[in-house]
Amino acid sequence: MIFSTLYPNRIAKSEAIINEAKKTENALKQVLGEDFKSGCWRYPGGHMSWKNLADADKKLEEMGLSWLDWNCLNGDAEPKKVRPVDVAGNVKFIENSLNINKVTDVAVVLMHDAESKELTAEALPKIIDYFKEKGYKFGVLD
């Protein structure tokens, strides 16, 4: 899902979140067709970044949306001094970040698709290979 603003003072207001969810759904329907429906929501910065989300979580659920967070990352938004500079480094960054988490039976990788993230696109086939070699399966979120 997309978002247009971060929540002021890291306090999320459910009305703003629901409006954002509706705007996002409408934008996606314009591109993908009126039949499009997502069942997933990712808070900007992740669920762990905000306070007072219980009401918003409930309202999102009423809209048929479940929130999800990432539990590992490829490092493409990290400070330049620690950001991977090649494909192998990108895969290693994911492996290291995944090893920090206690729950690794499901991996949700944070990656960005901005114009400046060429390495992310270049590394994607190797990232997929890495997860397949580790026995992960790929599926569709709806």
Regions inferred by a protein language model and the residue ranges of each:
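Aromatic/hydrophobic pocket-lining residues that form the small-molecule binding cavity
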Residues: I17, A21, N90, T120, ...
